[in-house]
């Protein structure tokens, strides 16, 4: 199994035979995993606020969730705090965030598309072992810049893979692996630029939650449905 980690979110090349794991640890992919664990049936990642409102008109009962600059979008039902996503049995979520939902849409060419985070790292690693494909871990970054927490998040998943299978790491994947092996998640997240920004905005509890390694046993898997990306709990994980 070959594993690569990207430094920045970018358009994927030659991913048709690979498993791609998109990470937006603070907070979109953590929120997606949390929403599915709380019973949400489907999550539609969208790039723009306008697209979110238009899609809501087509899906009866859907909830709008997301943020811009870390703050809940006016008119949305939910922000991007994973702590808001509780009691969602059977619900459909339309989610738009500054970074993560856009990166997910860049990865639709993958054979298998997964939303990964620290909270579901082991579930994602176990699923990747079942798939037995080469893997690209794709950090979302912050405003198109390198993101410490996403790069380390990839490393925690790699560490779990390395415990169970012989893996071949690219140079970037090796650096990610060593970063995660040497630093606990809570230290990475609180020291990161984006973590500090969220703490200053009043979301310290979010940062603490997003650092909880292996909290959730859920694998959010994306696929195209009528030309639109939708994320559901993987039916193949069990």
Swiss-Prot record:
GO terms for molecular function: 2-phosphosulfolactate phosphatase activity; magnesium ion binding; sulfopyruvate decarboxylase activity. Its cofactor is Mg(2+). It is an enzyme of class 3 (hydrolase). Its EC number is 3.1.3.71. It holds the Pfam family 2-ph_phosp. Keywords: Hydrolase, Magnesium. It comes from the Bacteria. Coiled coil: none annotated. It catalyses: (2R)-O-phospho-3-sulfolactate + H2O = (2R)-3-sulfolactate + phosphate. Belongs to the ComB family. PANTHER family: 2-PHOSPHOSULFOLACTATE PHOSPHATASE-RELATED (PTHR37311:SF1). This is Probable 2-phosphosulfolactate phosphatase.
